[in-house]
Amino acid sequence: MIRVLSLNLQHGLPGAGAGDGSASTGSLARADISDPATARAVMRATAEQIAELAPDIVALQEVDLGQARSGRLAQAAFLAEELGMPTCRFCASYAGPVVGLRRRPLRTALSSPTDDVLGLLRAAVGSGPIGYGNALLSRFPVSGWHVKRLGHGASSVEKRGERAWDPRSYHVSTASQRIMVAATLEVPEGAGGPIRQLSVASTHLATRESMAARQLAAAWGALAGLPGPHLLVGDYNLSAEQVEVLGLGRTVGEGFTFPAAGPKRRIDHVLTDLWPTGPDGLPLTDEAAAAGGSPLLRAVDWGTTSFIISDHVGTWVDLEPVG
């Protein structure tokens, strides 16, 4: 069995789950994570909650790297170390500060000053890489990393003032760049039955439905070209019905994930390969599906979990090979 967890970190901001009054998390409600020590305490508590679920794979979204608002912490690397997961990759949607000069990274890992067009200048004044994006963590070894840029939607202009001739009456919103980070993992004997490889990706799609649908199709198309079976995990900003109508893959798991204070929608998903059908259009039996040659996964358990951080709850799925 393989357990995968998806969690939108919301840059580690304490959320509804931090206000439950428990001894372990109550003191972190409304914590100022711009303080490095506090940021580390919040991330350490988050790691403890993740560890309780014992996932094999963790897909993260809205991850900060070196941002002032989150204590300059490399959040993905910190969580990987706390969890003892040797496989970790941060993938930047953009380099630069959250507020300020955002830019397209030369290389999305942002692991070296040369990965950012301004990286050498930052290094010269003693500053490290800075960015924002997604991440993948796993206890399984990795044989290859893959990145797919998914583009961004159109900018929008909102009129906020009364004077049509005054530029200050308008607010311009630019859509965020979206990205997918994928890994082909080597599955140890006994963890995935007969499956020895698995390709899994983490992504965070646009808030506009039409753009999110296009990005999802592009992400799945890129992932499907890697060794299967396949798992596309993350914050889609789409409902299960909106995902299923696209006919790209098969959603597994259920449970509302947003907003964390009182979840009413499921917008965080785990997508895997479509189940094959026979000439009558009906799904094949397990035996016939397994004999088709393409490895398949099915969900055997699932759930959602509230964390001390984020405006999302985490969603997890237990998967096993078919046949």
Each PLM stretch: what is its role?
Residues 3-9, 45-70, 137, 182-185, ...:
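Active-site beta-strand/loop signature of hydrolases that rely on acidic residues for catalysis
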Residues 9-12, 64-65, 94-96, 140-143, ...:
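Short, solvent-exposed loop/turn segments at secondary-structure junctions
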Residues 25-30, 96-129, 156-172, 239-244, ...:
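Alpha-helical membrane-targeting segments
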Residues 29-36, 63-67, 150-172, 202-209:
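Surface-exposed cleft-lining segments at the edges of enzyme active sites
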Residues 87-94, 145-151, 302-305:
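Conserved S-adenosyl-L-methionine
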Residues 116-132, 136-191:
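Active-site catalytic loop in hydrolytic enzyme cores
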Residues 142-147, 184-185, 209-231, 236-323:
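Metal-dependent phosphoester-hydrolase catalytic domains
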